[in-house]
């Protein structure tokens, strides 16, 4: 997460951002133990590259944990993998906007829309990443958390 953010930091911060690193939240679908590390990675990234201090570090950490936890819930409920995109878009889009709108003197609805639009690319990348890794981990089939065979592709 931190390395990807380092290389994409020119368009990963501010009112208009595409934070490609958030695609990695999708990995929590396959590896639920990543929920806390992804939040911590967001904290460290915002500490190293962000400009809004402790609020951004804590907010990013919370957003990362919530998004990854929602993705784990999607797997536990055995819902479609496509739904992985929803928390990758909405949790950062609506959550980060709560404090960025204040720091950037921008109305919350406008900030939230901007961030949600910017999260669409990482959400698509995240879904594709999970599907590709799943094929490598479970060749010839897709498996849910219970290991039951699924016909969803």
Place the predicted regions along the sequence by residue.
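Membrane-helix interface "capping/anchor" motifs
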Residues: 27-38, 73-83
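Membrane-embedded alpha-helical hairpins and interfacial helices in multi-pass inner-membrane proteins
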Residues: 9-17, 44-153
């Amino acid at each position: 997460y931190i390395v990807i953010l380092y290389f994409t930091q020119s368009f990963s911060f501010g009112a208009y951002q595409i934070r490609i690193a958030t695609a990695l939240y999708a990995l929590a679908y396959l590896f639920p133990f990543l929920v806390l590390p992804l939040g911590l990675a967001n904290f460290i990234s915002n500490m190293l590259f962000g400009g809004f201090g402790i609020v951004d570090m804590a907010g990013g950490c919370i957003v990362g944990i919530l998004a990854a936890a929602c993705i784990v819930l999607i797997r536990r409920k055995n819902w479609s993998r496509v739904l992985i995109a929803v928390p990758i878009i909405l949790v950062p889009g609506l959550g980060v906007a709560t404090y960025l709108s204040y720091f950037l003197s921008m109305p919350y609805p406008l900030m939230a829309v901007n961030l949600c639009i910017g999260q669409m690319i990482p959400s698509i990348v995240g879904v594709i990443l999970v599907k590709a890794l799943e094929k490598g981990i479970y060749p010839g089939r897709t498996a849910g958390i219970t290991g039951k065979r699924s016909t969803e592709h």
